[in-house]
């Protein structure tokens, strides 16, 4: 794959997350009864970064959980090498029933990952609402899903790939578009 363009560098990612944190606080009139839940892998780190920013702004900690949606994906025909579904589940430290859950992911594309995330959340509890925050929305939805908080809208073609790199995983903060060869 050839890198076509850098969309967000470290500073732009930091700014986008700070703006999203402010939008969350404003929309929810504070963050009481709100839980951030990151979708594995990069969504977890984005949720943690958002929680840090919200705590800096509001002065109160925000609960962060994580979910692994592998079992819930409808577009993965084989989950493991022996054809058994891979069950990871959720690690959410509090009951989400009657709480506002903000699902956090890195890239919104077809909507299938988010749908799987919502399925996983409903298996854990019944939140009063589910909101969606993404660092990048690249379009090309296959399901009627829309993000409530978006770091950056990036129009792409289906032949392009948007890659998010985060320091916690990739030792670098960067969002770039790559062209498939």
From Swiss-Prot:
EC number of the protein: 2.4.2.9
InterPro entries, alphabetized: PRibTrfase_dom, PRTase-like, PyrR, PyrR_bifunctional
Biological processes annotated in GO: DNA-templated transcription termination
Signal peptide: none
Effect of residue 141 to Q: Loss of ability to regulate the pyr operon; highly reduced affinity for RNA; no effect on UPRTase activity
GO molecular function term, any single one: RNA binding
Record motif PRPP-binding, residues: 101-113
SUPFAM superfamilies to which the protein is assigned, alphabetical: PRTase-like (SSF53271)
Superkingdom per UniProt: Bacteria
Keyword presence, Transport: no
Chain sites annotated for binding substrate: 41-42, 105-113, 138, 162
Effect of residue 41 to I: Reduced ability to regulate the pyr operon; reduced affinity for RNA; loss of UPRTase activity
pH-activity relationship: Optimum pH is 8.2 for UPRTase activity.
Effect of residue 152 to Q: No effect on ability to regulate the pyr operon only in presence of excess pyrimidines; reduced affinity for RNA; no effect on UPRTase activity
Keyword Zinc: no
Misc note: Mutagenesis studies identified four amino acid residues that seem to be involved directly in binding of the protein to pyr mRNA: Thr-18, His-22, Arg-141 and Arg-146. Arg-27 and Lys-152 were also likely to be involved in RNA-binding, but mutations may have altered their subunit-subunit interactions. Arg-19 was implicated in pyr regulation, but a specific role in RNA-binding could not be demonstrated. UMP and UTP increase the affinity of PyrR for RNA.
Matches recorded under HAMAP family: PyrR
Summary of subunit composition and partner proteins: Homodimer and homohexamer; in equilibrium.
Record family assignment: Belongs to the purine/pyrimidine phosphoribosyltransferase family. PyrR subfamily.
Protein name according to UniProt: Bifunctional protein PyrR
Protein source organism: Bacillus subtilis (strain 168)
Lineage of the organism: Bacteria, Bacillati, Bacillota, Bacilli, Bacillales
């Amino acid at each position: 794959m050839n890198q076509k363009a850098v969309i967000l560098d470290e500073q732009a990612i930091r700014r986008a997350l700070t703006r999203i944190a402010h939008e969350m606080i404003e929309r929810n009139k504070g963050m009481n009864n709100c839980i951030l839940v990151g979708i594995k892998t990069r969504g977890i780190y984005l949720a943690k970064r958002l929680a840090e920013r919200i705590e800096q702004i509001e002065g109160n900690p925000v609960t962060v959980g994580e979910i692994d949606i592998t079992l819930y994906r409808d577009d993965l025909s084989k989950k493991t090498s022996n054809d058994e579904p891979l069950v990871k589940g959720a690690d959410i430290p509090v009951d989400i029933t009657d709480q506002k859950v903000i699902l956090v992911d890195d890239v919104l594309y077809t909507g299938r990952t988010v749908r799987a995330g919502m399925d996983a959340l409903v298996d854990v509890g019944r939140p009063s609402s589910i909101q969606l925050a993404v660092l990048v929305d690249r379009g090309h939805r296959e399901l009627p899903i829309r993000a409530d908080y978006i770091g950056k809208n990036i129009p792409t073609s289906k032949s392009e790939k948007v890659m998010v790199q985060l320091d916690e995983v990739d030792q670098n903060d960067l969002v770039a578009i790559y062209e498939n060869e």
